[in-house]
Amino acid sequence: FDIVSAPETALPAEAKITLVNRLARASGMGGMAGGQALDLAAEGSSLSEDEILRLQAMKTGALIRFACEAGAVIGSAQDADIERLGEFGAAIGLAFQLADDLLDLTASSEAMGKATGKDAAAGKGTLVSILGIDGARKRLAGLVGDADAALEPFGARADTLRATAHFIAERKA
């Protein structure tokens, strides 16, 4: 918030207000903080697929969505383009979390550089625990497809973003 709202930040006042508002929503009770509260409240209980998706959209999805929208706002993009980039960010946010959950079950601790199997050991509900590994991989491919579709109007200008979505889904650690 400090950087976005600082007087020396070279952005028009309207852009600063838009960014502060979007960051507040992404990080507040409708975003990361609310998602974390849901996550903590759900410890020890099983969540439905919809509940897991909502929680993940509020946490990782909201922050990555904001990052994508922020670049568009700073670049003075049209509202429709800001929305498309937000959709891209939401899709890759969910894809990142799903890929992370898959790696937690399928990758070695050595490859990950951290302990794996923590979610299962803690009884934490994930999409992988509901869909299974194959179902989760199919869902992950669908999320990458959603991300690609959101970028369609941008053509080749969005190739780096497309590559980012594919990297997230295909990473091994």
Stretches found by the model and what they are:
Residues 1-173:
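All-alpha prenyltransferase/terpene-synthase fold signal
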